A protein has these predicted regions:
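Residue-level recognition of tetratricopeptide repeat
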Residues: 88-91, 125, 170-171
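TPR/TPR-like (Sel1-like) alpha-helical repeat modules
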Residues: 120, 148-170, 179
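Bacterial Sec-dependent N-terminal signal peptides
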Residues: 1-41
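Terminal, low-structured helical/coil segments at or just beyond the last alpha-helical repeat
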Residues: 165-215
């Protein structure tokens, strides 16, 4: 090539070479970003799967202890699980799930305790109120007086009302239970015979340990 031709075409070739190198770098960057994005998606999926497996694992462990009749061991393990969670929201969910497991094995005293723990972590946890209502309704007796045992249903109604106030998704179920358990309240006559009237406070003793207002 003549010197004039080199001067004429040389710079264009250099430019094309630099352009190809630049485009190669951009395409390589895009490829790297795509690979990185894929890794992030995969990592996110792995994390979610691991979290789900961990949750299922602790519930399985809890269930095994309960199947063996080791309620105390299940409670201790449940408390240990709560200590491992670093967030109040996470603790609330786990406490509720533990309460469900305990309730299914008829460990209602311990189940109620974990419901209250869930509410201590999240006062707006409607499901915990709903479960408390179910536990109280399933085990209302704490005295030999029938009318006083029926006062437990005031507590049931209070928790059902609170549950639907906090969680709209629980409204239908709560209303159905409200209609059912409102029929189990003591009559005014029965309460009057025991010296109680509307507006009086009654302490629900036994395993419950809560107070209600007669209305």
């Amino acid at each position: 090539m003549k010197e004039g031709e080199h001067k004429k075409y040389g710079p264009d070739r250099n430019f094309r070479r630099r352009l190809l190198l630049f485009l190669g770098g951009v395409l390589g960057g895009w490829t790297g970003m795509a690979a990185q994005s894929a890794c992030l998606v995969e990592s996110s999926a792995d994390f979610q799967a691991a979290a789900l497996q961990e949750e299922r694992s602790f519930l399985d462990t809890l269930s095994v202890r309960l199947e063996k009749g080791d309620v105390a061991g299940a409670v201790n393990y449940g408390n240990f699980v709560l200590q491992q969670d670093s967030t109040e929201a996470g603790k609330a969910v786990k406490a509720y799930e533990i309460a469900v497991e305990l309730g299914q094995k008829d460990a209602y005293v311990e189940a109620a305790s974990f419901c209250k723990k869930a509410l201590s972590y999240d006062i707006f946890f409607g499901k915990a109120h709903l479960l408390l209502a179910r536990l109280y309704a399933a085990h209302p007796c704490w005295t030999e007086e029938r009318a006083l045992n029926q006062c437990t249903y005031y507590l049931v109604l209070d928790n059902l009302i609170r549950a639907k106030q906090l969680d709209v998704a629980l409204e239908k179920e709560s209303d159905e239970l409200l209609a059912l358990y409102s029929k189990k309240l003591p009559t005014r006559k029965d309460l009057f015979m025991l010296g109680y009237t509307t507006g009086d406070r009654v302490h629900i003793g036994g395993w419950i340990g809560e107070s209600i207002i007669i209305r």
